[in-house]
Amino acid sequence: MSIKYRLIIMNFLQFFVWGSWLISLGGYMGGVLHFEGGQIGAIFATMGIASLIMPGLTGIIADKWVNAERLYGILHLLGAACLFYASTATDYNHMYWAMLLNLLVYMPTLSLANTVSYNALEQYKCDIVKDFPPIRVWGTIGFICAMWAVD
């Protein structure tokens, strides 16, 4: 399988994960778990917290100690464990911490996916400016497919 197809699959799955819960989680927390609006908002605010803190820290880790591909895989496995735990949460505190931990490990994967893609394209002597946008658009398609599958 060519590098472009492998990167298409990676980008598709990267955003499929996010699309599988981002839009439907609020309705689930309000309708099924009966969380209040402020609680739902606080859980979604963890995305901003994680976005501010973690990409820089994981960038340092990826630059100094662990290569980006390995760190990317580790973070996704940790995120899967957090999402599995979140699926069992029935109260606000457990859901809040599960989603905070999930987003602390998921948000850095957005930039790591780009790093992995750029490095792979460069290694295979591809034109990043020309070849990456059609690959990245499959992330958006993955997000949309996940929303359709879940809702």
Question: How should these model regions be labeled?
Answer:
Residues 34, 66, 88-93:
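Helix-breaking motifs and short loop linkers at transmembrane-helix boundaries and internal kinks
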Residues 12, 82, 92-111, 116:
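Hydrophobic core of transmembrane alpha-helices in multi-pass small-molecule transporters
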Residues 3-11, 72, 95, 99, ...:
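Hydrophobic alpha-helix/TM-entry signal in multi-pass membrane transporters
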Residues 70-84:
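Structural signature of the two symmetry-related core transmembrane helices
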Residues 1-49:
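Helix-loop boundary and gating motifs at the non-cytosolic
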Residues 29-30, 61-63, 137:
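Interfacial helix-cap and linker-helix signal at transmembrane-aqueous boundaries
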Residues 53-67:
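Helix-to-loop junctions at the C-terminal end of transmembrane segments
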Residues 48-56, 144, 148:
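Residue-level signature of mid-helix packing/kink "hotspots" within the transmembrane helices
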